[in-house]
């Protein structure tokens, strides 16, 4: 049997709409991600378990893990009979790359089970394709960091899908999921079809400056440039209490904050553990809306999807 864990990810990071994403892991050792197991069988079977298994489609063929198996078999040109188990630890529609976790874990597990017939580039292309079935368009800002780890910049030129951007070891990512769902498709539909010239210029300046600051090792500058003129001004209205939360975490001392992916999870960057804890405490009390919500203090997950058993 092969068992693969794929970590949560925070896409966009305010400054890089659809082109930046970071894999994250809680500092307390909690597994924030999905696990998929694969073993040989006489015919295909899929079993779901985990905290959020009851949120999955009841029809197996609608489950993205089934679709991963089906597409992987197509890529190899043969049917591979396996029993798969999805441990769904990630809330759906959370802005933490829930579907990317399932896709990355399923495809890496299948590839390992079959002796690695597909290279990383081919696997990543399949992940983007399958993620696109859920979000409505192919984009890699969750699957790339989830699969490869670290902070990833989407390139999509010269046969290169993404490349890693150096992160900062001192950064702590406070992630607060309020317990409500935001559809990626709905969050994309709310965005304008066209943008003002000054917003396009500001976006380019912020993103170029952020990448420069990462490579020139200027964490304060990098954090200061994490501004969103593309999505947040429009998506904030979908997130109850988001604007107040951003103001509060800034006053506590967060270096930057914004919407993780398409929301509703909020991320806040801190460079001191005590600041991160105060931010986490405030968000736990004021941003969470029900028992399904949670707050985690995280660091970059540099390993990405990996075999755990």
Curated annotation (Swiss-Prot):
One of its GO terms (cellular component) is cytoplasm. SUPFAM superfamilies: GHMP Kinase, C-terminal domain (SSF55060), Ribosomal protein S5 domain 2-like (SSF54211). Transmembrane segments: none annotated. It is found in: Cytoplasm. The keyword Magnesium does not apply. Pfam families: GHMP_kinases_C, GHMP_kinases_N. Pathway: Amino-acid biosynthesis; L-threonine biosynthesis; L-threonine from L-aspartate: step 4/5. It catalyses: L-homoserine + ATP = O-phospho-L-homoserine + ADP + H(+). InterPro entries: GHMP_kinase_C_dom (IPR013750), GHMP_kinase_C_sf (IPR036554), GHMP_kinase_N_dom (IPR006204), GHMP_knse_ATP-bd_CS (IPR006203), Homoserine_kinase (IPR000870), Ribosomal_Su5_D2-typ_SF (IPR020568), Ribsml_uS5_D2-typ_fold_subgr (IPR014721). One of its GO terms (molecular function) is ATP binding. Belongs to the GHMP kinase family. Homoserine kinase subfamily. PANTHER family: HOMOSERINE KINASE, HOMOSERINE/4-DIPHOSPHOCYTIDYL-2-C-METHYL-D-ERYTHRITOL KINASE. Catalyzes the ATP-dependent phosphorylation of L-homoserine to L-homoserine phosphate. This is Homoserine kinase. It comes from Salmonella paratyphi B (strain ATCC BAA-1250 / SPB7).
């Amino acid at each position: 049997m092969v068992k693969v864990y794929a970590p949560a990810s925070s896409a966009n990071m305010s400054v890089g709409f659809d082109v930046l994403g970071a894999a994250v892991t809680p500092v307390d050792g909690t597994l924030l991600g999905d696990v998929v197991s694969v073993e040989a069988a006489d015919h295909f079977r899929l079993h779901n378990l985990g905290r959020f298994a009851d949120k999955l489609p009841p029809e197996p063929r609608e489950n993205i893990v089934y679709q991963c198996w089906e597409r992987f078999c197509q890529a190899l040109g043969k049917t591979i009979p396996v029993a798969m188990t999805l441990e769904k630890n990630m809330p759906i529609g959370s802005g933490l790359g829930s579907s990317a976790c399932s896709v990355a874990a399923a495809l890496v597990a299948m590839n390992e089970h079959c002796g690695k017939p597909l290279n990383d580039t081919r696997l990543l292309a399949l992940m983007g394709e399958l993620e696109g079935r859920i979000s409505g368009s192919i984009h890699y800002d969750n699957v790339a960091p989830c699969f490869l780890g670290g902070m990833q910049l989407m390139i999509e030129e010269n046969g290169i899908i993404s490349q890693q951007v150096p992160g900062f070891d001192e950064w702590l990512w406070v992630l607060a999921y309020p317990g409500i769902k935001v559809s990626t498709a709905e969050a994309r539909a709310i965005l304008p079809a066209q943008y003002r010239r000054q917003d396009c210029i500001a976006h380019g300046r912020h993103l170029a400056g952020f990448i420069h600051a990462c490579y020139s090792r200027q964490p304060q500058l990098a954090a200061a440039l994490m501004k969103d003129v593309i999505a947040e001004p429009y998506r904030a209205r979908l997130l109850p209490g988001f604007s107040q939360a951003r103001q509060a975490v800034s006053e506590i001392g967060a270096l930057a904050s914004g919407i993780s992916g398409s929301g509703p999870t909020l991320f806040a960057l801190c460079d001191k553990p005590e600041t991160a804890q105060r931010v986490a405490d405030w968000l736990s009390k004021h941003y969470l809306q029900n028992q399904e919500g949670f707050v985690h203090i995280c660091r970059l997950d540099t390993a990405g999807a990996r075999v755990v058993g």
